[in-house]
Amino acid sequence: MRRHIIGTLFLCNKPASTFSPLSKFTSEELRLLSSFTHQIAIAIENHQLNNSIHSIFIDYIKSISAALDARDAYTHGHSKRVATYSVGIGRELGLTPGELEFIELSSTIHDIGKIGISSDILNKPGRLSDEEFKIIQSHPHKGSKILEPMSRLSVLMPGVRNHHERYDGKGYPDGLMGDDIHLIARIISIADTYDAMTSDRVYRKGLSKEIACQEIEKCAGTQFDPNLTTMFLTYINQYRENEIIKADHKPDTAILLQA
């Protein structure tokens, strides 16, 4: 039995009948109305439950991102910046609020596979050897394996597994080409590369915004989707360094919570 009120149903006067100007609701009508309000209550509670599940889902994604940042000291904040840039590209494309949130969440955990990489390699204060670089290149595959058993996170798989694919088919791990690469992965690829170029590392200073944009533009049609490259350059030229992801897109639970 419910012990709390979640809403009220207000009934106006019942239309008068031929024989009575002040008709009353019959017991049968009241029974039907009671059944109707019960169904409404169930629908409302289910909606509230979906919202609660969605909030837990979002918090889980943020926790994963925080864990990644804690392991890789030199790329602290990388996931959030990539998410910001990726959502910016999505807005330039005119994507829906639900699609924007999908992009935000996918890009937030795009490097989840690095959890399976040794901290000694992630935090090495210098350039990586060829063997170490191969190990780093395994993180998209490791990330997809981490997500595989978690059905609610499987919708984020393309951004995790394929953000290092190239438009010309020379990327990894699957060697996908052109539009065979999922849209979210093509978006994250640009955002991820831009942030990597403009971020400082122990062994080098980050590139300026202008030089990084020139490099991105040079790689349009080879490494990156040319149309998305144009969208990115339009967005980044308006980008403010203190910009954060604004919560102006609402959850699309049909996309995010599918089993």
Language model: regions and residue ranges:
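Metal-dependent catalytic cores of enzymes that make or break cyclic nucleotides
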Residues: 17-27, 51, 55-259
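Allosteric cytosolic regulatory segments
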Residues: 30-41
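Sensory-domain boundary capping and coupling elements
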Residues: 1-19
